Amino acid sequence: MVKFTKKDKRKNKKLMPERNENYMNNIKKLCGFCINEWHLTTMILPYISKEIENNYKMITILENSIEENIKTLIKKLNLKNEEDILEINWKQSVAQKYTEVGSKLNIIAKSDEKYIILVNGRKNFIDVVNKHIDKWLKKNTKVKQEIKIINCYEITDFNYNI
């Protein structure tokens, strides 16, 4: 018979580091799928417009730029917050190193505003970015505002690894 205990027999040794009791309660992870950049643009634009009206700020980490698609679609739509949407960086992001992702996320730590982090690309790209985001969140446990992380996978390979 095996007995599982939480007690550590070494003196003054904590099993888990102390954290803010609200740690990760303010983080929501969402998932979506798109076929290409145009599909992403038409899918995400109404959602982003609504969330900007709800006082969310936006950070994008994109494998491919969708800036031209956003500009083209905004010209054809009548949105209240066109300027706010165009101010978002819709260009391709370099996200292979933690410092590249961390520098984008440091804006959150300096602010009290709610944020949406949009991550778009193929599975490998999103996996790397999410590791960097998780590492950043563990280092910045004092961040208390609401953060939504939207992972939007680009489905270019149709296989069972999704």
Language-model features and meaning:
Residues 2-162:
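Non-catalytic regulatory/interaction regions at protein termini and inter-domain linkers
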